[in-house]
């Protein structure tokens, strides 16, 4: 998962100071609203909502905004939107497989915007099922590497909660579990005093494509263009990008 994980942790670091933080806030608020609409407005009885709120708070989304989103989703406040969850599949430069997750109130707009962003950046939209089989739906918790913390320490804290593996991804430890165990793993890590920096349902690649600097730069440009769309919540891809190549791309 090296390339994808490095990119994920890089995005996480940048998110707090990103000039487009308002767009990030909007995506997080949308996730909270949909979670409340789907499973009710009480996070104690709705783990998906609890995780969405925790993620929003970790990115400094104001509490008032979060509370209003919960109330809109649960029907306590007017103005809630009926969002549709849609996943698009694509191939990018270098044969990289891409999954695009959207939450949209306009399927036609989302499809058009995603297609344009992909094709303008050297990719092609693929038929349903032609890409998704290369990924597994998992829970992924990122834990900050504090002084003295080891992979074994992390594994010991989260194993009984359903963790399958712990990976060292640079400045964080990545805990992988079944998607249904995400909430339990996050809670176990937090209860053990570990610094959880994110907890998400993710599509992790079962097969990766190794990229050199030029195709890597093209793929990351495509990913950023797609992520910038209002209807897009997440983008997953199976590029394996080494540290050296990431440094070249970022220079």
Swiss-Prot record:
Keywords: Cytoplasm, DNA-binding, Transcription, Transcription regulation. Its main location: cytoplasm. It is found in: Cytoplasm. One of its GO terms (biological process) is regulation of DNA-templated transcription. GO terms for cellular component: cytosol. The keyword Transcription applies. This is Probable transcriptional regulatory protein Francci3_1368. Disulfide bonds: none annotated. Belongs to the TACO1 family. One of its GO terms (molecular function) is DNA binding. It comes from Frankia casuarinae (strain DSM 45818 / CECT 9043 / HFP020203 / CcI3).
């Amino acid at each position: 998962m090296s390339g994808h994980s490095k990119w994920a942790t890089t995005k996480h670091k940048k998110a707090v100071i990103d000039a487009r933080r308002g767009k990030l806030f909007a995506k997080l608020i949308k996730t909270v609203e949909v979670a409340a609409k789907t499973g009710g407005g009480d996070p104690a009885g709705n783990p998906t909502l609890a995780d969405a709120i925790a993620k929003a708070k970790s990115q400094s989304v104001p509490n008032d905004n979060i509370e209003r989103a919960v109330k809109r989703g649960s029907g306590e406040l007017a103005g809630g939107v009926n969002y549709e969850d849609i996943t698009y599949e694509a191939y990018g430069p270098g044969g990289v497989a891409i999954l695009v997750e959207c939450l949209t109130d306009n399927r036609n707009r989302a499809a058009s915007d995603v297609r344009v962003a992909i094709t303008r950046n050297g990719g092609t939209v693929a038929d349903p099922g032609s890409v998704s089989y290369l990924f597994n739906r998992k829970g992924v918790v990122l834990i900050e590497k504090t002084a003295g913390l080891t992979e074994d320490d992390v594994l010991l804290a989260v194993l009984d909660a359903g963790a399958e593996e712990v990976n060292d991804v640079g400045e964080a430890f990545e805990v992988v579990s079944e998607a249904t165990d995400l909430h339990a793993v996050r809670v176990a890590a937090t209860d053990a005093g570990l610094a959880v920096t994110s907890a998400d349902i993710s599509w992790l690649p079962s097969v990766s494509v190794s990229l050199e600097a030029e195709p890597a730069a093209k793929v990351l440009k495509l990913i950023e263009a797609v992520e910038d769309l209002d209807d897009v919540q997440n983008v997953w891809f199976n590029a394996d990008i080494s540290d050296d190549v990431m440094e070249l791309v970022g220079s």
